[in-house]
Amino acid sequence: MPNLKAIRDRIQSVKNTKKITEAMRLVAAAKVRRAQEQVLSTRPFADALAQVLYNLQNRLSFAETELPLFEQREPKAVALLVVTGDRGLCGGYNVNAIKRAEQRAKELKNQGIAVKLVLVGSKAKQYFGRRDYDVAASYANLEQIPNASEAAQIADSLVALFVSETVDRVELIYTRFVSLISSQPVVQTLFPLSPQGLEAPDDEIFRLITRGGKFQVEREKVEAPVESFPQDMIFEQDPVQILEALLPLYNTNQLLRALQESAASELAARMTAMSNASDNAGQLIGTLTLSYNKARQAAITQELLEVVAGANSL
C-alpha cells in the first residue's frame, strides 16, 4: 500500500515547484514586454539613420570609394559571432543556436576556411571553451535587455578583426524571434558590407498581447522610409566622410537589433518552457491526488474490515 505521508509530501513539493515555474513564466512575460518597448523606442533613430545612409549611397559609387568595411576579399578566415544566453531553463534556445554555429563552422572548415569564434553568452562560452575551437573573444553576463553600449563594444571588436584582415568575413548567428513558440537560428553576414550600397529593407516589430487568457505575439510590418534628401542639397563635408562617421552607428544598430531579437527569443522560450512545466505540474498534482485518495480509501476500507473481523470473532 502506498505511503500516504510520502504521497502527501510529494504533492506539496510539486505545488511549491509549480508556484516557482508560474512566477518565472510571469517574469519572462514582463521582460518580453520590456524587450518590445525597447525595440519600439529605438525605431525613430534607426529609421532616421537608415534614411540618411540609404540616400547617401544613392549619391556615391562604392566601387570608386575606398571604405574598409566594403572591401571584398577572398575568404581565408571567417569570424562567427554566436549569440546565446547566460542561463538555462529556456527550452532548446541555447542548444539550437550552438548547433547552428557548429554546422556553419563545419561548412566553412570543409571549404578550407579557418574559423574564429566571437561568443556572446555564458552558454556559448562554456560549450565552445571545452572544445577545439579558436575563440577570439567572449562576452558573458551582459544585461538581460541589450543596450547600445554593449552592442557598440562587440561591434568595435568585430570591425577590428575585419579591418586588420585577421578575418576576411564576419558572420552573425543569432536566434530570430518569430513567435512565443517558434524561434529560428539564422546566419547573417555583417562584413563586408554590400558593395552595391546599404539598402533600406522593410522591417518588422513585435508586440506581446493577451488573448483568451494566454500570451500571444503580433508582428507588424513596417515599410521602409521613402523620404529622400532634395537633390540640390549641399553637404558641408564630403559625403564619404559623413558615411564613415555614420557606419559605426549603423553597425551598432544592426547588432543591437540582433541582440534584441535573441533576447526576446530566449525570454519567449523560457516563458513557454515554464508554462509547459506549470501545466505538467498541474497534471502531476491531479494524478498524485487521485493516488492519494485511492490509498486513503484503501486504508479506511482495510481498517473497517479489521474492525468487522474483530467483532465477528467475539
Curated annotation (Swiss-Prot):
Primary location recorded for the protein, binned into one broad class: membrane
Pfam families from the UniProt entry: ATP-synt (PF00231)
Membrane topology note: Peripheral membrane protein
GO cellular component annotations of the record: plasma membrane; plasma membrane-derived thylakoid membrane; proton-transporting ATP synthase complex
Matches recorded under PROSITE patterns: ATPASE_GAMMA
Organism superkingdom: Bacteria
GO MF annotation terms: ATP binding; proton-transporting ATP synthase activity, rotational mechanism
Keywords annotated in UniProt: ATP synthesis, CF(1), Hydrogen ion transport, Ion transport, Membrane, Thylakoid, Transport
GO biological process: proton motive force-driven ATP synthesis
Localization of this protein: Cellular thylakoid membrane
InterPro entries per UniProt: ATP_synth_F1_ATPase_gsu, ATP_synth_F1_gsu, ATP_synth_F1_gsu_CS
Assembly and interaction partners: F-type ATPases have 2 components, CF(1) - the catalytic core - and CF(0) - the membrane proton channel. CF(1) has five subunits: alpha(3), beta(3), gamma(1), delta(1), epsilon(1). CF(0) has three main subunits: a, b and c.
Family: Belongs to the ATPase gamma chain family.
Function statement: Produces ATP from ADP in the presence of a proton gradient across the membrane. The gamma chain is believed to be important in regulating ATPase activity and the flow of protons through the CF(0) complex.
This protein's name: ATP synthase gamma chain
Organism of derivation: Synechocystis sp. (strain ATCC 27184 / PCC 6803 / Kazusa)
